[in-house]
């Protein structure tokens, strides 16, 4: 019974952290006080999905991994690769596909990043906007075809160019931040 109690507490704690991160990612741009944290969370999210995704699978989230490992401490679980799959499909029991959830998530994160960039600073470097939409569209195509959780094959030219666009996007935004252009 104690394990069940602690399992529930840990699950609630990680659910709270995940929901907080999702809300900041999607709506942090709407409030002046959360503009910078929104941009930071979005950059961390996209970096995790793509950079860490090279090693752990496209769409990888370190918070989801920690959530899964923490719950596994209390006994084996079948935690899905995506937190949104966990909450929407398993906890809320909503009848939809994992692929629809992933595609919607990609669209919302990149759209929120576009809004956040506009609200945080106005850049003369249109390359960032082009890289943002190229990354978004390419990830939508890749995830629609392959899903998430697969380790990308860098010899696939489309995946390679998508990763390159994402890395360039992240780098250019960080460069703007370091130059204090925002």
What do these predicted ranges mean?
Residues 28-39, 117-126, 179-182:
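Membrane-interface helix-boundary motifs at transmembrane edges
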């Amino acid at each position: 019974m104690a394990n069940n109690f602690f399992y529930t507490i840990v699950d609630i704690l990680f659910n709270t952290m995940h929901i907080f991160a999702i809300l900041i990612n999607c709506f942090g741009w709407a409030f002046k006080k959360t503009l910078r944290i929104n941009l930071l969370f979005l950059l961390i999210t996209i970096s995790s999905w793509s950079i860490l995704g090279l090693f752990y699978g496209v769409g990888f989230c370190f918070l989801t991994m920690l959530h899964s490992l923490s719950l596994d401490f209390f006994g084996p679980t079948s935690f899905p690769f995506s937190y949104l799959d966990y909450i929407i499909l398993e906890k809320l029991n909503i009848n939809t596909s994992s692929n629809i959830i992933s595609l919607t998530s990609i669209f919302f994160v990149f759209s929120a990043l576009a809004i956040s960039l506009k609200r945080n600073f106005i850049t003369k470097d249109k390359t960032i906007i082009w890289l943002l939409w190229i990354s978004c569209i390419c990830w939508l195509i890749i995830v629609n075809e392959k899903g998430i959780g697969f380790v990308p094959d860098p010899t696939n030219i489309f995946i390679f160019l998508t990763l390159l666009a994402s890395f360039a996007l992240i780098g250019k935004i960080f460069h703007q931040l370091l130059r204090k252009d925002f």
